[in-house]
Amino acid sequence: MSPLLTWNLICVSSRWYTILCLKNKVKFWLGTRLVHEPESMESRSSPYIRPSPYAGGVHPHFEEEDDRSKLHASALYSERRTSSRKSLRSQKIDYHTTTIKSLWFDFCARTSSHGIPYVATSSFFGRYVWAALFMCMLMAFLLQTYWTMSEYLQYRTIIEMQLQFEAAAFPAATVCNLNAFKYSELTQYEEIKEGFDYWERVINARMMSDSMKPGGDILEAISVRKKRSKSRDQLLFPIDDEDLEGAVYQPVFVRCTCMNMEQCVPNRNPLEVNASICMCFEDVTRGLIWPCYPTSVWTVKKCSGCSISNTCPDPDGPNASKQIAKHNSPLPCLCQSISHHCMVHPKDEIRWWNPNNYTVYSVTEPPTTEITETEEAFGLSDLKDAGAITTQTKENLIFLVAALPRETRRNLSYTLNEFVLRCSFNSKDCSMERDFKLHVDPEYGNCYTFNFNDSVELKNSRAGPMYGLRLLLNVHQSDYMPTTEAAGVRLVVHEQDQEPFPDTFGYSAPTGFISSFGLKTKELHRLSAPWGNCSDTFRPVPYIYNEHYSPEGCHRNCFQLKVLEICGCGDPRFPLPSEEHRHCNAKSKIDRQCLSNLTSDSGGYHHLHEQCECRQPCHEKVFETAYSASAWPSQNFKIGTDCPAVSDIFNDTEACTEYYRQNTAYIEIYYEQLNFESLKETAGYTLVNLFSDFGGNIGLWIGFSVITFAEFAELFCEICKLMYFKGIVYVQKKMQGKEYTSSSLMHIDFLQRSPKKSQPGEDEVSTNESTKELMSK
């Protein structure tokens, strides 16, 4: 053999050996992969796989026992968890043989949920125990989910507070005089004057009644009344021993108002009807009259010991025996049995008393003492306390003034120049025409709002009283109404786009003081539905306060509409929605009673929650106020030569100072600090918290995830497809059965009607055989 041939044989042998080695390596690699990756073996080598009893189930199967034992662990894993690799999803489903049960067992074998795969086990005990355990955990999960949803649906909120260090916008400030109207202007209207007269009589009667109680001092009570009456030329009474010195008394008839035998007050109008006739003590030297009693309690007696003032002790009084023994010259006298005071009977007839000209009238029959409808409407007859009487009179005054035209009501109160004497903001002068706006309030008359324009934003350059709003206000106390109990001004701090309500939210500042109001601002940010009920655009229709919406105005609007609906008239304390409506009449008993009943039944305009829909604004500013005061003006402070006191005092500094103390109030409104609090309402339990808790609960109790729900959705779709296909197959079979039956019957009918002749009996046999053949098919 040649060397070349030998070399060629060696090369060929080497190549074959190399190929054989590579082939062995491939076989080894395939065997190793078969052991560690049963899925690959399952999908590529069908001889190694034996189908599972359930759809999609696979079992490894090897020829040799040793190989089966080596792959025992992998076979179990493949049977329990990896059967989904060859499930009904990855195969073409045979809807003729597949059932819902097979789909369910396939789902249990491949689902990612915990516990459900054990429900499909072949063990009877394991199957029902795991099913019961899963149902218990499912109930616990549903209960926990109910609690979680309940927490979310409560829509709880939390408040986040943040302090912002920047200058806040200056608010609007509304100032009013505590005396709403000028008394000198009101008395020009007869109805209003009658209201004051009626209040005067009732107050006098109550004070007289209190003084005549055990322990009461009648002189003290009358002294108080006299001091209140002197400045207005009202009815005067003797008040102390000095006034009684030199007095000469005589009896006079007077038309008066009597609450009972002990309470009679002279009427200022002697011609007034519906008044009683009384007899009073009159001091002819001073024109004073006191006390008065009904004529029924006066009797004519013989008195001894009468003084030069024509007063005598009652002979039937407690000290009658001593007086008679001491004086032996009795005179005819008139005595009353209430306080046992007597007067010498005049020689002439007893005359009528008139506070103006003392005209004598003839005695007539006593007119009726019944309370008129007007007096009953005023509501003073049943009141005993002087404060309650005054408060009710103020309300009556609101009703009386509301009946006047709008322009007339403005003229009854104070103008801007009369009320505001000085004004400065941020150490600069104010512009009266530009910075102030008139606001007419039913209770406080003409009020004036500073910084009313919401398009202009005023800010303080610094904190403190020197850089805020400073106002010097003149209240004109000399022209106060008798029902005004305090002298001063009313202040309301509010947002520019809100209606001021001085009767509810205001602060009072007295005269003779510098009243300092330090402000702190809080910005509120509320959440809208479903966490809250706020709205920045909500407006009830109709709305009596125009565009200035606030919850307080909404409640008043609702109450006013309710009054208009039930009573046919509006409450004079609130505006009317249109000119077509009217305010309730102060003298109408029906109107006043209807309004009173509605207020009592509803509990006031803040309690009509069922009939009213009032929402809080989503963004609101709240101003907290700290009050302090100091005396104004100081002794050495130079007010100036422009003193509005009496003109003949010229440059009398003391007189000007006293005038300012009695009639002016200095107001300071400022920020204590140039920062504000921002209170923001946030959701306490959000949708993110809900999903987080829901995921935790479902993972804790039943071991589900979002993927598990997708698997259930897939199972549901497969069942629906199966049911749909089963229905189609059922309908097709039914239709095919009907067609086959009809064709068979037609064939039988054709055979029966065939014209072919046959021997007797042969036709019947052939027909029966054909029918049996068709039926067997």
From Swiss-Prot:
Q: Name one GO molecular function term.
A: monoatomic cation channel activity
What the entry lists under InterPro entries is as follows: Deg-1, ENaC, ENaC_CS
Which residue ranges does the record annotate as region Disordered? 752-777
Q: Which UniProt keyword terms apply here?
A: Glycoprotein, Ion channel, Ion transport, Membrane, Sodium, Sodium channel, Sodium transport, Transmembrane, Transmembrane helix, Transport
Glycosites: 274, 319, 357, 411, 453, 533, 597
Any one GO CC term of the record: neuronal cell body
- What is the protein's membrane topology class? Multi-pass membrane protein
Q: Which cysteines are joined by disulfide bonds?
A: none
**What Pfam families does the record point to?**
ASC
Q: Which residues lie on this side of the membrane: Cytoplasmic?
A: 1-128, 711-777
Mark the transmembrane ranges.
129-149, 690-710
The similarity annotation says: Belongs to the amiloride-sensitive sodium channel (TC 1.A.6) family.
Record-linked NCBIfam families: deg-1 (TIGR00867)
Q: Which PANTHER family match?
A: AMILORIDE-SENSITIVE SODIUM CHANNEL-RELATED, DEGENERIN UNC-8
Mind telling me what this protein is named? Degenerin unc-8
Source organism of the structure = Caenorhabditis elegans
